């Protein structure tokens, strides 16, 4: 109060007013405050104050030659007065308007290329459809989402190298472009940005948007792919949502979606093979998604999904430390436990050996359609707060939490025997047995759980065993909340190990993932997935198995032919014949195999009965474990197109048709390739011609190694001996001549000698 009086007093004196309004501010502290550093201390005030002046902008002197002094309205555009302290001119804001309307045009060709992500966004919005607005409570949960549609998946470091190479190609600095995607992008962008006049810094910013995935931890109630996130502010508020269908898709979302489908298919297939881990790796390495190798995508793509994480673990990559159970992602937020094996009795008096977690723990559970907070002690559920989209989703979460709690009343609620098996026909572990049992029918579980009266807590409500809401009673410890539970925000990744059966463990030995956790949901991939591994031939059904098997034999005929005569057992055990077995009726597989193997042996023994077409046609049948029987077959049955179709042992059929003239094989009407040699014509002439320059010494001699094909003979040195496989499937020993002079006589003697050697 005193100070104010004093100030008023001062202001009443005319001299004070004059000093404050007319003289310069010369207090050192104030001058320091407003002049130290380049940082503007009050930008908005400065801006308003500047724009109130007549000429707030400075420009290069050359502007006076490019812009008239006055515009059409006679307003002055620039001042003849120089800017104090520089040789620039003072310019009016009106000059900017004049320049925008009348200034020179530059080429705009590069704009859509540089601002590609913006142009594409406009197109998506133009073609998108906005539906009605609904007012309802929004259960949003924070998830890590991709906020940048249309990007490649380079790491920040990789992108930096690409940008430097594209924008500043002549700058010095070590940059190594190694990955295929880096090289492709660099080449593409250099081409696109020839003679680009846009400032390099801007180009660099825009390239970064295009190359790197940007994620944010945002509250989301609906779709999480980037084309939905870019309109999040338009589609969901606190109490409303607006329906929206994007007007286009972007490759990064398609890759994420296709990667999940490929990974699920591969994990499911690997789980049923003899060595799941080896098979999984073989498939990951031989699969392409949208033309890019799956292993490259796995290294770069941060998608977290059970199957994808199993594939990453197999490749030795780090994954999230949360674990999966019943399709929910669990993250322990506090507490700890030790594990102990314990035997328990089900309601059906079946003994189960379960690993009990002893100790108090709290978890967040996040699923696609429901989330929860779970507090538990040793074999006891203390509290479960669930929120979900609908009754069904809430029930799923409750079942998973009840099983996870390992409570006795849950185990006693089992009716009937637990004998669930996985795809490979192996029994599931006890926890998954229980889960499957209650997922089929949870009535008894919910009835036996017990109910309790509840307090009225804001935003919470009770739920009864029949899944109806209630404000008075609820299942013991269970409440339904209006608020969702956020996904675990940390993006930390941990080192994990994986065993032969694809169980992924953290360094403490806790199981984080297993094939049982991989969703059975089938989807159609957005990008083409090319599985080169024979294990995945069956993904497209029986016809694909049939065609692929025969294509494989034809492609590898040279080596197959040699193995057929030298080491048939090894050939029969090839994994490429595995998928074919599922097409042959189980009851007769063994007999077919025995019959075909006997037939092949006769071909090897009896001269001149080698028949290429027949070997190719029957070979896949010989792969099954043979049963010895006297049965003869004129045709063999395969199950395709919903019924048994016949392959004739001698001659063509719709299933297997070889055209002698074109040498093309068609399987079920689909082209299966061309045979490089003609199977049915007497090939002795051809062979004797090829054997010119070689002396035939006699029968095969094992000391000289496995039989070579005729094509491989050219590698022999003069005087070198080798076994060679000739057209009839017979093997003879030859020596490359030391002199060229006698070559002509070879072809005549060859034919005679072959006969003698064989007989």
Swiss-Prot record:
Subunit organization: Influenza RNA polymerase is composed of three subunits: PB1, PB2 and PA. Interacts (via N-terminus) with PB1 (via C-terminus). Interacts with nucleoprotein NP (via N-terminus). Interacts (via N-terminus) with host MAVS (via N-terminus); this interaction inhibits host innate immune response.
SUPFAM superfamilies in the cross-refs: PB2 C-terminal domain-like (SSF160453)
Marked site (Mammalian adaptation) residue numbers: 627
Keywords: Cap snatching, Eukaryotic host gene expression shutoff by virus, Eukaryotic host transcription shutoff by virus, Host gene expression shutoff by virus, Host mitochondrion, Host nucleus, Host-virus interaction, Inhibition of host innate immune response by virus, Inhibition of host MAVS by virus, Inhibition of host RLR pathway by virus, Inhibition of host RNA polymerase II by virus, mRNA capping, mRNA processing, Viral immunoevasion, Viral transcription, Virion
GO terms, biological process: 7-methylguanosine mRNA capping; cap snatching; DNA-templated transcription; symbiont-mediated suppression of host cytoplasmic pattern recognition receptor signaling pathway via inhibition of MAVS activity; symbiont-mediated suppression of host gene expression; symbiont-mediated suppression of host mRNA transcription via inhibition of RNA polymerase II activity; viral RNA genome replication
Subcellular localization(s) per the UniProt record: Virion; Host nucleus; Host mitochondrion
Location of the motif Nuclear localization signal: 736-739
Main function: Plays an essential role in transcription initiation and cap-stealing mechanism, in which cellular capped pre-mRNAs are used to generate primers for viral transcription. Recognizes and binds the 7-methylguanosine-containing cap of the target pre-RNA which is subsequently cleaved after 10-13 nucleotides by the viral protein PA. Plays a role in the initiation of the viral genome replication and modulates the activity of the ribonucleoprotein (RNP) complex.
The protein, known as: Polymerase basic protein 2
GO molecular function, one term: RNA-directed RNA polymerase activity
InterPro entries noted in UniProt: Flu_PB2_2nd, Flu_PB2_6th, Flu_PB2_C, Flu_PB2_CAP-bd, Flu_PB2_middle, Flu_PB2_N, INV_PB2, PB2_helical
GO cellular component: host cell mitochondrion; host cell nucleus; virion component
Major localization listed first in the record, in broad terms: virion
Keyword Transcription regulation among record annotations: no
Taxonomy, superkingdom: Viruses
Stated family: Belongs to the influenza viruses PB2 family.
Record-linked Pfam families: Flu_PB2_1st, Flu_PB2_2nd, Flu_PB2_3rd, Flu_PB2_4th, Flu_PB2_5th, Flu_PB2_6th, Flu_PB2_7th
């Amino acid at each position: 109060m005193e100070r104010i009086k004093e100030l008023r007093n001062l202001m009443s004196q005319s001299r004070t007013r004059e000093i404050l309004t007319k003289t310069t501010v010369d207090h050192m502290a104030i001058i320091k405050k407003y002049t130290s550093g380049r940082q503007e201390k009050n930008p908005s005030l400065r801006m308003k104050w500047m724009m109130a002046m007549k000429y707030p902008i400075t420009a290069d002197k050359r502007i006076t030659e490019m812009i008239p002094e006055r515009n059409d309205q006679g307003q002055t555009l620039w001042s003849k007065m120089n800017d104090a302290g520089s040789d620039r001119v003072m310019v009016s804001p009106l000059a900017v308007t004049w320049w925008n309307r009348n200034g020179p045009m530059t080429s705009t060709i590069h704009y859509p290329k540089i601002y590609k992500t913006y142009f594409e966004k406009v197109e998506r919005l133009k073609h998108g459809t906005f539906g009605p607005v609904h007012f309802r409570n929004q259960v949003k949960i924070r998830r890590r989402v991709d906020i940048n549609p249309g990007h490649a998946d380079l790491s920040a470091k990789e992108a930096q190298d690409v940008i430097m190479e594209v924008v500043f190609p002549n700058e010095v600095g070590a940059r190594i472009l190694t990955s295929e995607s880096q090289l492709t992008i660099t080449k593409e962008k250099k081409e696109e940005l020839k003679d680009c006049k846009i400032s390099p810094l801007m180009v660099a910013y825009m390239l970064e948007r295009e190359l790197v995935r940007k994620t944010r931890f945002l509250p989301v109630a609906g779709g999480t792919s980037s084309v939905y996130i870019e309109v999040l502010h338009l589609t969901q508020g606190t109490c409303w949502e607006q329906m929206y269908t994007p007007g286009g898709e972007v490759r990064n979302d398609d890759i994420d979606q296709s990667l999940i489908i490929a990974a699920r298919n591969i994990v499911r297939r690997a789980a049923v093979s003899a060595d799941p881990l080896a098979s999984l790796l073989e498939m990951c390495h031989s699969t392409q998604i949208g033309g890019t190798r799956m292993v490259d995508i796995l290294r770069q793509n941060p998608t977290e999904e059970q199957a994808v994480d199993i594939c990453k673990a197999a490749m030795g990559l780090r994954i999230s430390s949360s674990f999966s159970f019943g399709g929910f992602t669990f993250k322990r937020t506090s507490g700890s436990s030790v594990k102990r094996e314990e035997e328990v009795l089900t309601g059906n008096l079946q003994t189960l050996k379960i690993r009990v977690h002893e100790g108090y723990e709290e978890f967040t559970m996040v699923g696609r359609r429901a989330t929860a907070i779970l507090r538990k002690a040793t074999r006891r559920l203390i509290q479960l707060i669930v929120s979900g989209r609908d009754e069904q989703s809430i029930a799923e979460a409750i079942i998973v939490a009840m099983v996870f709690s390992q409570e006795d009343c849950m185990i006693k609620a089992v009716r009937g025997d637990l004998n669930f098996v996985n795809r490979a026909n192996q029994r599931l572990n006890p926890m998954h047995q229980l889960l499957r049992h209650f997922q089929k029918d949870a009535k008894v579980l919910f009835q036996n759980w017990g109910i309790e009266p509840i307090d009225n807590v804001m935003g919470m409500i009770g739920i009864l065993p029949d899944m109806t809401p209630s404000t008075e009673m609820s299942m013991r410890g269970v409440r339904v909340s209006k608020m969702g539970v956020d996904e675990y925000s940390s993006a930390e990744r941990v080192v994990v190990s994986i065993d032969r059966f694809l169980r992924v463990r953290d360094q403490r030995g806790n199981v984080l993932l297993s094939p049982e956790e991989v969703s059975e949901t089938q989807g159609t991939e957005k990008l083409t997935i090319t599985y080169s591994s024979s294990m995945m031939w069956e993904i497209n059904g029986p016809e694909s198995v049939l065609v692929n098997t025969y294509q494989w034999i034809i492609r590898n005929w040279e080596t197959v032919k040699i193995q057929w005569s030298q080491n048939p057992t090894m050939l029969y055990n090839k994994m490429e014949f595995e998928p074919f077995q599922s097409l042959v009726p189980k009851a007769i597989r063994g007999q077919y195999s025995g019959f075909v193997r006997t037939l092949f042996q006769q071909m090897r023994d009896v001269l001149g009965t080698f028949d290429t077409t027949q070997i190719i046609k029957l070979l896949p049948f010989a792969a099954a474990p043979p049963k010895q029987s006297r049965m003869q077959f004129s045709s063999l049955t395969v199950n395709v197109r919903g019924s048994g179709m016949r392959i004739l042992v001698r001659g063509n059929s719709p299933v297997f048709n070889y055209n002698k003239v074109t040498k093309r094989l068609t399987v079920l009407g689909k082209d299966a390739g061309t045979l490089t040699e003609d199977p049915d014509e007497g090939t002795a002439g051809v062979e004797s011609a090829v054997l010119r320059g070689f002396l035939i010494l006699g029968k095969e001699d094992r000391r000289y190694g496995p039989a070579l094909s005729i094509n491989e003979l050219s590698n022999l040195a003069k005087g070198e001996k080798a076994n060679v496989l000739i057209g009839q499937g017979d093997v003879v020993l030859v020596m490359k001549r030391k002199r060229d002079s006698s070559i002509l006589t070879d072809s005549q003697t060859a034919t005679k000698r072959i006969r003698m050697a064989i007989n």
